[in-house]
A protein has these predicted regions:
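Glycine- and charge-enriched loop/helix tracts that form the active or gating conduit
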Residues: 1-157, 161-165, 169-189, 193-209
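Histidine/acidic-rich helix-loop-helix segments that form or flank divalent-metal centers
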Residues: 2, 132, 137-139, 151-152, ...
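Residue-level signal for secondary-structure boundary elements
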Residues: 13, 17, 39-42, 91-95, ...
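Polar low-complexity intrinsically disordered regions enriched in Ser/Thr and small residues
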Residues: 49-51, 55, 235, 249, ...
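A glycine-rich phosphate-binding loop feature that marks nucleotide/adenosyl-phosphate handling sites
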Residues: 101-104, 113-118, 168, 214-222, ...
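Conserved alpha/beta core segments of nucleic-acid transaction machinery
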Residues: 125-133, 276-285
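Short, low-complexity, polar/charged sequence segments that are solvent-exposed and flexible
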Residues: 182-184, 237-240, 284-285
Length: 285
C-alpha cells in the first residue's frame, strides 16, 4: 500500500472483481479517486488492450473491464454523488477516461418511484465520442479526449464542468456529422442538439431544474463567442441585448453570473484545440 501511494497507483485490496461484486459503488469510487488524486488505476486481473490516443495525457497503456451490470442495483443518489465529486476533481479528465475505458459510463442505476424501483441509464450517450475523429486543422484530440481536456481546463464549478462534459455530446451523430468540401469531419450545429441531449441526461439524473437550465444554456451557447472575435463589438452587444430580453434570467446579477460561466466554458473549450491559439481558425470553426 505504501509503495502504491509513492508510485501514485490506485488498486483494490486483493481480487478486483470480488471487491466490485461486494460493493458496486467501488467502481465509481475508483474513477472518482483517480479524478481527485491523479493516480493510475491498475488491477492484477483482466488487463486489456491500450485505450485512447497515444501520447496524450489521457492515454491508458492498459484498459480494464468492470462488472458494470452490478451498478444497476445502486441508487441514483449514490451514483450522482460520485459523479459530481469526480467532475470537481483536479484530474477529472483522467477519472472520466477510466470510466469510459471500463464501460462504466454505459452503466445503469435505479430510482424509486411510487414505492417501486426502476433502472435508468447513467451516461451511455458519451460512449460514441471515444475515438471519434475531428478535423485536425482545428483539433488536436478526438472528440472524447477534447472533452476531457476542456473539463480539465475549466474552473472547478459543477455547472461549468457538466456543461463541458456534455458540450459536444451530439458530435458524430447522424444528421450532425458530415464531411466538408475537403473531406474532413464537420459537426456544424452540434451545439443545439447537444443542449437537447444535455437536458435529457441531467433531467434523467434528477438534477434540480435551475441547474439543468443553466447547463443547457451554457451548452447551447458555447460556440457563440468565437465568431464575435472577428465580427466585433456591435454583434456582441446585439447578442447581449437579445439574451437580456429572452427571459432566461431573473435579474442582471443572474445574467452576469451566467456569462462569467460561459466565458469560462468558451476558454476551456478553445484551450483544448489548435484553434484556441489562432483567432482566424477560431472564427472559421
Amino acid at each position: 500500500g505504501r509503495q502504491d501511494l509513492q508510485q501514485k497507483i490506485l488498486r483494490t485490496v486483493g481480487d478486483a472483481p470480488a471487491r466490485y461484486q461486494e460493493d458496486a459503488l467501488r467502481m465509481y469510487r475508483a474513477c472518482r479517486f483517480v479524478g481527485q488524486l491523479g493516480f493510475d488505476y491498475v488491477q492484477r486481473q483482466g488487463a486489456g488492450p491500450a485505450f485512447g490516443q497515444p501520447q496524450t495525457p489521457y492515454y491508458m497503456p492498459q484498459s480494464y473491464s468492470f462488472p458494470v451490470s452490478r451498478s444497476a442495483g445502486l441508487s441514483l443518489e449514490r451514483v450522482r454523488t460520485e459523479l459530481d465529486k469526480l467532475l470537481l476533481g483536479k484530474w477529472a479528465g483522467k477519472g472520466l477516461m477510466l470510466m469510459m475505458a471500463t464501460g462504466l459510463a454505459a452503466g445503469r442505476c435505479r430510482v424509486r418511484e411510487q414505492g417501486t424501483y426502476r433502472e435508468i441509464d447513467v451516461l451511455p450517450e458519451l460512449e460514441h465520442l471515444a475515438g471519434l475523429p475531428q478535423n485536425q486543422r482545428f483539433h488536436c484530440y478526438d472528440v472524447w479526449e477534447h472533452t476531457l481536456a476542456a473539463v480539465d481546463n475549466s474552473p472547478r464549478q459543477l455547472a461549468i464542468r457538466w456543461a463541458l462534459l456534455l458540450h459536444d455530446v451530439a458530435k458524430g451523430l447522424p444528421g450532425i456529422r458530415r464531411l466538408n468540401k475537403e473531406g474532413q469531419p464537420s459537426d456544424h450545429g452540434h451545439e443545439a442538439e447537444s443542449a437537447v441531449m444535455a437536458e435529457v441526461i441531467l433531467s434523467r439524473l434528477r438534477y434540480p431544474a435551475p441547474f439543468v437550465q443553466r447547463v443547457v444554456w451554457l451548452v447551447s451557447r458555447h460556440m457563440r463567442f468565437a465568431p464575435m472575435l472577428v465580427t466585433g463589438e456591435r454583434t456582441l452587444l446585439r447578442w447581449l441585448r437579445s439574451e437580456a430580453a429572452g427571459g432566461n434570467f431573473k435579474d442582471s446579477h443572474e445574467m452576469t453570473a451566467a456569462f462569467e460561466q460561459l466565458v469560462a466554458v468558451f476558454l476551456a473549450d478553445m484551450g483544448a484545440t489548435h484553434a484556441g491559439k489562432n483567432t482566424e481558425l477560431m472564427a472559421e470553426g
